[in-house]
């Protein structure tokens, strides 16, 4: 949904959302065609899942909302059931995003890499400042608003934090009940 991002994560396979191309946001028309394609090729499958990710999907927030609305309309017409999910770095999360996602997203993935020093090292803004202090309070509020269910605080762990069990424990100490661990090899 977004070939763009507001962070410069050191291990990003999407090259700050560019995917080895140019920065761009998916149009509503392209997203609509993708949902139509999914419906047309789903056969007798009733349950369909769409994950909004990027880059950072909240950089294209209006299109996310519009595509969810379109998907909900199509459910009735085609006897389908969409399960929408969202993966975010949290920078643009606000009350409106939380409220909408709590209503419409079957799951949200909150990207946080554990302890402050690890997260800020691996997930900085483009100019180098850390993002931990901005995103952690939002993610804590969001997890509580989802009754500690149907979300994951997902840590991406690298050679930089081989003691990642400390990061998992830190996430638990922050109050997260749903924790996911994704290993990766980072260049630095």
Model-assigned labels for residue ranges:
Residues 1-28:
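Canonical Radical SAM [4Fe-4S] cluster-binding loop centered on the CxxxCxxC motif
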Residues 22-26, 58-59, 130:
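Short, surface-exposed alpha-helical recognition segments that flank or form part
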Residues 15-20, 117, 186-188:
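A short, flexible beta-alpha/helix-coil linker loop
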Residues 54-55:
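Short acidic donor-binding/metal-coordinating loop in glycosyltransferase active sites
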């Amino acid at each position: 949904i977004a070939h763009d991002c507001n962070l410069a994560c050191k291990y990003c396979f999407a090259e700050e959302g560019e995917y080895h191309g140019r920065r761009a946001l998916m149009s509503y028309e392209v997203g609509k065609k993708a949902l139509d394609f999914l419906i047309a090729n789903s056969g007798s499958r009733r349950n369909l899942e769409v994950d909004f990710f990027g880059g950072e999907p909240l950089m294209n927030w209006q299109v996310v909302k519009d595509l969810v609305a379109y998907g909900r309309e199509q459910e009735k017409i085609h006897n389908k059931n969409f399960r929408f999910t969202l993966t975010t770095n949290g920078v643009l999360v606000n009350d409106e995003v939380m409220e909408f996602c709590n209503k419409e997203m079957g799951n949200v993935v909150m990207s946080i890499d554990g302890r402050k020093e690890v997260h800020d090292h691996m997930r900085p803004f483009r100019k180098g400042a850390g993002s931990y202090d901005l995103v952690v309070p939002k993610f804590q509020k969001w997890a509580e608003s989802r009754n500690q269910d149907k979300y994951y605080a997902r840590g991406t762990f690298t050679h930089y934090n081989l003691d990642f069990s400390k990061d998992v424990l830190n996430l638990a100490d922050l109050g997260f009940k749903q924790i996911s661990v994704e290993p990766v090899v980072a260049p630095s």
